[in-house]
Amino acid sequence: MSDNDSRRRLADLNAQLKLHDVLYHEHDAPEISDAQYDALVQEKRELLEKFPELSAYNDYEGVIGALTVDARLPKIAHREPMLSLENSFTIQDVEKFISRVKRSLNMDPEVSITIACEPKIDGLSFAALYEKGSLIRVATRGNGHLGEDITNTAKVIRKLPHKIANAPEVLEVRGEIYMHHSDFEKLKDVCNFANPRNAAAGSIRQLNPKIAEERNLRYVAYCIVNSALASQEAILKQLAEWGFCTHTEVLFADNMDDALSFHTRMYNTRSTLGYDIDGIVYKVNDTHLQKLLGSTSKYPRWATAHKFPSTEAITKLRDISVQVGRTGVITPIAELEPINIGGTLVSRASLHNLNEIARKDIRIGDSVIVKRAGEVIPQVVGVDHTARCNSAVPEEYVFPSHCPSCGSTLSRAPGEVAMRCTAELSCQAQVLERVKHFVSRDGLNIVGLGEKQIEFFCNASYISNVADIFSLREKISHMNLSAEHGWGEKSIALLINAINASTTVKLSNFIFALGIRFIGKGAAKLIAEHYRSYSAWVRAMTSLANGEDPDNIHGIGLKSIESLRAFFSSEDNLRVLQTLEEKLNILNEIANTETASPISGKTIVFTGVLEDMSRNEAAKYAETLGAKVGNTVTTKTDILVAGSNSGSKLDTARKLGIQVMNESEWKDLLKTVSNSE
């Protein structure tokens, strides 16, 4: 590459980066994927390393953030700049970071240095200022020097302390605001947000705090500005003691191998978190060393963000189909030229809704950017408009006017972005999806009734609503099911046993299983703990349907209340409930806060093989005694119950000093519970 070519390429890269920084930071409307942006940054970095003389022509250093264009929100000057983090894309980049730190501190390269490893949440940075223990103001990062005042909306974020005991005279806490995947799924039907990050950013900027509260924003705190504490580990511990939410997964690594292993583990398990992370932040743990290292105008020298490998790829959009969800929402699906993303062949991806197709200007024949995050359904996140060819359909995509399953006219409710089929129980596709939801793990957990079996019974008209599941036992005895493809005596017996085992169910699981719109797992538990019994819940919901005022249940918003009212106003739904009431033993719900058991309020993790019960059964029983059951061992885990063939969870628990019980000790503990009742 000649000098002129390299100079032109640098100018082109700077122009592209400047444009995309404005789109991302000022408008929350990126036109390229994170992976594409990172590739531009990496190319510029390599170009400047190869041609150092180009530094004289580098007229764009990027931005820390940018002041979002929203004149409604007052601006706040930060007491200390909110800097960005320098990115590391490869192991070599991380090695350079560690070497640079040691060199700057005049350390022997062979001497270890403790690194705090924290997940990098893909959200919105904030700074919360406290004076004399009281929350005074909360601001966004903005451009790093000037942020937006989001105090009123931030005050409705769950578990963000308004008062702190034993706090210094002035305290500034920083962290990240984000939205859980389950809350985004509920919101995307009614609001035009492309992803959870954009949804969190848009929600926190609402002038009406009630709207932000209903959207259930969450946060993680990870910084105390100008802290006198000796380490990042001590800072996180102090934040937790003050009542702030902190990362559940953190590692303090004494060598780079451990840090990289943590990066790999979090990359492999990120889909189980329920929120987006896009890398791991490495910080020098010793705060005295942090101060010695200092910062550039853009980045702290004592930290770097080790980004995850790209989970995105570009492929051709062959066609657009639509599918019907259990609540009637019509979701457009991208039919793709098959492409390998992260080791999985992807041929279909979600397009979210009609508004997203229009906003991104997606057309059949386009080269589209597809993102796959763990077990989350792949989604189209953008279009490479520069690659649009003559074969791309010139007209905008026309959304169907009728349901592809039942032929009913589609409609869109005021204030919603999703098109919907309102035929409900007369729509076969909705019935199918409702049954799948009903038997899912967090519903009645009928293990022997999988997707193919459900489709078979629905298509054969043996199931027309969820209550029909419990008449299958009788129907199977009158049909020659074993003659059907895929059915044998063993699978039939397993199915009948699974249905029999599911007839006893906790109230919260039952409410969730009904698939009522806006009533997810968390909301179902809040409702169940409020009413305690099935009969009390049904009485209250019947009164609600008859026009009486709703009960005040903390955490249950107006949309959820109206959805419950609509559900109990349907004669079809009431008939199904009546049948289920006759078929099931619905257990009363025990509120965690009022359970007197020795495990009430404790976080318990099960691992290995238990002899007397399955881990799922053990977890359910622990929850009825007021315990919280986790999937991974963290510093917040209280007890690990280890069966035979326990793996890495046992090693982690021992390393963290967490109480470990074998199955016999666990059963002895449960005996003390039963003896006290």
From Swiss-Prot:
The keyword Nucleus does not apply. One of its GO terms (molecular function) is DNA ligase (NAD+) activity. SMART domains: BRCT, LIGANc. PANTHER family: CHROMOSOME TRANSMISSION FIDELITY FACTOR 18, DNA LIGASE. GO terms for cellular component: cytosol. PROSITE patterns: BRCT (PS50172), DNA_LIGASE_N1 (PS01055). Gene3D superfamilies: 5' to 3' exonuclease, C-terminal subdomain, 6.20.10.30, BRCT domain, DNA ligase/mRNA capping enzyme, Helix hairpin bin, Nucleic acid-binding proteins. Zn(2+) binds at residues 403, 406, 421, 427. It comes from Anaplasma phagocytophilum (strain HZ). Its EC number is 6.5.1.2. The keyword GTP-binding does not apply. It catalyses: NAD(+) + (deoxyribonucleotide)n-3'-hydroxyl + 5'-phospho-(deoxyribonucleotide)m = (deoxyribonucleotide)n+m + AMP + beta-nicotinamide D-nucleotide. DNA ligase that catalyzes the formation of phosphodiester linkages between 5'-phosphoryl and 3'-hydroxyl groups in double-stranded DNA using NAD as a coenzyme and as the energy source for the reaction. It is essential for DNA replication and repair of damaged DNA. Its cofactor is Mg(2+); Mn(2+). NCBIfam families: dnlj, PRK07956.1. This is DNA ligase. Keywords: DNA damage, DNA repair, DNA replication, Ligase, Magnesium, Manganese, Metal-binding, NAD, Zinc. NAD(+) binds at residues 34-38, 84-85, 118, 141, 176, 283, 307. Residues 594-677 form the BRCT domain. Belongs to the NAD-dependent DNA ligase family. LigA subfamily. It is an enzyme of class 6 (ligase). The active site is at residue 120. GO terms for biological process: DNA repair; DNA replication. InterPro entries: BRCT_dom, BRCT_dom_sf, DisA/LigA_HHH, DNA_ligase, DNA_ligase_AS, DNAligase_adenylation, DNAligase_N, NA-bd_OB-fold.
